[in-house]
Amino acid sequence: MSAWIGWKPRSCDPRVASSRLRCLGPLAELQSRGYPVELFEPRHLDRYAAIVYSKVYDDASYHQALELRRKGSRIIFDLCDNHFYNPRSLKYWEEARERLRRMMTLADALVASTEALAETMQRELAPDRAITVIGDPVETAIDNYPMPRWRRWLALRQWASVLAKLKVDQNQGRTPLVWFGNHGSPYAEGGMLDLQRIRPVMEQINRQYPISVTVISNSRWKYERSIKPWALPTYYLSWHPATFLHAVRAHAIAVIPISHNPFTLCKSNNRLALALHEGLAVVADMIPSYREFGKACCLGDWEAGLKRYLADPHLRTAHVALGKAIVDDQWSMPRVADRWQKLFDRVLAKNNIASAPHPKDRAGLSYREL
């Protein structure tokens, strides 16, 4: 058996954020270092010393992992969402919970995207199980995945239309705000409709400080029904890798309202960190993973936070600079890949298999095991 690691995400679709953040991005970074890791390939089962199952715990994957473990491979299971949360007591998610617990019990190493999620996972396991916390990296480039040309053309055309409207607004003194993210989940509250909670504040502030709101998401229907009727200019842009980061950078402030429940409280800091890294001030609701950015954004008080930023561009600039420093120190792709590499080295060492040499000694690894 060689020292190779196979990484199996739930989806290889680059439009799925968890696929990029929990597999494709770190994998590409590690491959650029010459580290022996690849996207899982069934034809290469005999070469894998370890396999990462990223949010994958269906029956077929479980039995595959069971057989690979019997043959000596190490199993790593990574989770980035609280799939134990089932507020509607749906049968599907009750069964999924059992499958998830089964996969975690089988795994030799467990990874969670946040400390809150690690604590949730811990409650489902034996008290002595260790869980490694490896957060999401901040992406600096997304438009390097293959996409149909016609989709790219359509996305660029749509973005040009929105950008033209933003320029007109800015010439009229409007400050552009943005919300971006998945429109929502079928099994937990949250997503685009969280904006409804701050609608009264936004409409009131718009009378004093003219603003616009752009929604970058994956449900125009939900936007048309719930956001477009607001009493201020709003725009919709379908998420696409060719336009997303350009669109985010065209705004001044990101708004991230979050309904508190066991699902959202386990989410990572990725949206907040990405917005700060791209130069936007951020007003958001507090969740545990946002705590380290508390001095680089406005958390919790929507009216006061928005008014502070709209009245004081210099404060926005100062907070963005502080936020970027935190991201560069802790949440860049190379830094997060370091944590994955350290985990893989440890797992391979238990099999008495040497990993590829580190291209360079990286200081200041932020690695923690709960």
Give residue spans per PLM region.
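Nucleotide-sugar-dependent
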Residues: 85, 187-193, 241-242, 246-247, ...
